[in-house]
Amino acid sequence: MPPFRRQVDDERHVPDIPEIRSDFAFHMEGSQDIDAWVGMFLDDLRRQRLDENTIVFFFSDHGGCLPRGKGFVYETGTHVPFIVYLPPKWRHLANGQSGRTDRLIGFPDLAPTVLSLAGIEPPAYMQGKAFLGEYEAAPKRYEFAVKANQASHYCPERAVTDGRYKYIVRYIPYKHDALMNAYQWGMPGNICWDETYLGGRCRSAVCPMTFERHCAELFFDLAEDPYEIDNRMDDPACAEEIRRLRSEMSRFLRDTGDLGFFLKAQRLTPTPLCEILRDEGYDYERLYRLAELSSKVTPESLPYLTECLASPRKEIRYWAVVNINQLAATGQIAKVPEAFAGLLGTDDPEIAAEAAYAMCLTGRSEEAMAYLTAAGPNGRLDSHKLTMLELLTLAPDAGSYFTGDVRRTVRAVVAADPRQTA
């Protein structure tokens, strides 16, 4: 069997359709090209007699557009190839490490490691830890992964692993992996996965997974399930490991001052946002608690969430809306607070569009869809409205929202500017 075909056969986390096979084969061919390209540089080092004085790092970034690859916190999106070669005269800097290792490292560790190899102590403010050299740190127990903006869709996720077990938390659980962005959906595999599912031609258990509403939390045993398909969150045998990794994730947010829960527009400031917040003495704890609440929110939290809707802080209002949306998406409430209707008339398009989602789910779709389909003075729909309309197309009762008038309005806007389909 040809090597590419054999490797594609092993991709159990994606449906077996020709376009996905083609995308994977194309990626593997590119990997072979890179291998030859790296060989040219190594040969050049030898020709210049620099090879015995050069420490070589070889690694990739997080990939291109393969389905469930870059942009997702599954291992297929975060686990990259990484090789370090130390010539014999510098091998003592490996401190006895050789061959393959299961040691956990991440890209923040690269700069401290290079400093350590040069005999320079990494400064304490660096988040990463050196894994080679004079100032090598003790191996880490945990490695973390972050999903921030996914093109036009804001859907933050975080993950933590100890190498064996993996915990993922999705802070906006009602959003789907199948929400498109122009970068990844430029590949045939993603497009045809959509067409296969929406056309009712699914033949694979993994085919519907990206179209289902997210579980708020996921837990995987990577030794038994390296493709992260079997979510073990409800397995009593995993309860202690889940508690441990959930606690580590909560600690990570606070230790790093994670800014990913501020909206994109808030982070586009001339002065770095972290400096602004530091000078204000910002209360991160309230924000993190609100974001973490979304995975376990119940109607008992509604009075507090309604209070948060009146906060002067945009990010607090936004995360209050997210929690109320989650209550609506999981059928825990039949109506939203009356303050939601007022959000549609505010100058906060991110919050207004998000609020329209829960209004659709709780019997107020007419006014919500009127807002979402109202074009601006330039005749275009803003990106926040478009992303929420896309999310609503995946709702179980989407047909009741996209009536004839709504469809005609959306088609007219898109026809006037086809770029808005992304």
Residue ranges: model-predicted function:
Residues 52-54, 98-162, 240-243, 247:
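Polar, surface-exposed loop/tail segments
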Residues 42-45, 49, 87, 117-122, ...:
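A generic secondary-structure signal for well-formed alpha-helical elements
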